Curated annotation (Swiss-Prot):
It comes from Helicobacter pylori (strain J99 / ATCC 700824) (Campylobacter pylori J99). The keyword Oxidoreductase does not apply. It catalyses: carboxy-S-adenosyl-L-methionine + 5-hydroxyuridine(34) in tRNA = 5-carboxymethoxyuridine(34) in tRNA + S-adenosyl-L-homocysteine + H(+). InterPro entries: CmoB, Mo5U34_MeTrfas-like, SAM-dependent_MTases_sf. Gene3D superfamilies: Vaccinia Virus protein VP39. This is tRNA U34 carboxymethyltransferase. It is an enzyme of class 2 (transferase). The gene is cmoB.
Amino acid sequence: MLICNDKFNPKTLLEEIMALRPWRKGPFEISQIKIDSEWDSSIKWDLVKNATPLKDKVVADVGCNNGYYLFKMLEHKPKSLVGFDPGVLVKKQFEFLAPFFDKEKKIIYESLGVEDFHEKYPNAFDVIFCLGVLYHRKSPLEALKALYHALKIKGELVLDTLIIDSPLDIALCPKKTYAKMKNVYFIPSVSALKGWCERVGFENFEILSVLKTTPKEQRKTDFILGQSLEDFLDKTDHSKTLEGYDAPLRGYFKMLKPSKR
């Protein structure tokens, strides 16, 4: 949890926080008020925080949401830190949080998506984190190309995506929805993802972790509006989504942009 112990009027502060719902990423604690977000993002952060050193590096978080991971990255003392997300609400959340967790104003927040950010930042970053974005893209190869082009030579990508458990070079393409999400298009096997990344130009593809999503990590709280994981799974078989697909399984990966291609 990210904690700020500055003192504020608790009633006014809570009203501001609730007006910014839903809170997907977190948790945060400000002046003893806990923002109990839908996702316990510390679980994912613990899996990727030591993937590569960030000290004195130029670092990006693509699909940064409200900045939870950006604030955690500050603790590793990067040279610079840029977050990218086109969402309007999540930027408002970041602007609310930044005075508490980025008091030195080190983070740059850009309202750009994965398809667009590399045009403004070509060959710019030593490390890019892209967590929970790829399966939302209609063209995952184009998204991977954008990430590749935004990295410096010998830069590293830390990637998290939904995956399917299969030894084959295949991807699940949900017919209409996946776990009630309409914007999920391609969920690859690890082998298929490795092939995509290598076709784009990445090398040294490394599996960091594979983890099932559980209610410990994603659940309903008072700080979101609507449903969460328990509503997206089959009521009698939690190994399946409501649509009959395998329940969410996430892979965490690291790869390198080589010096020559």
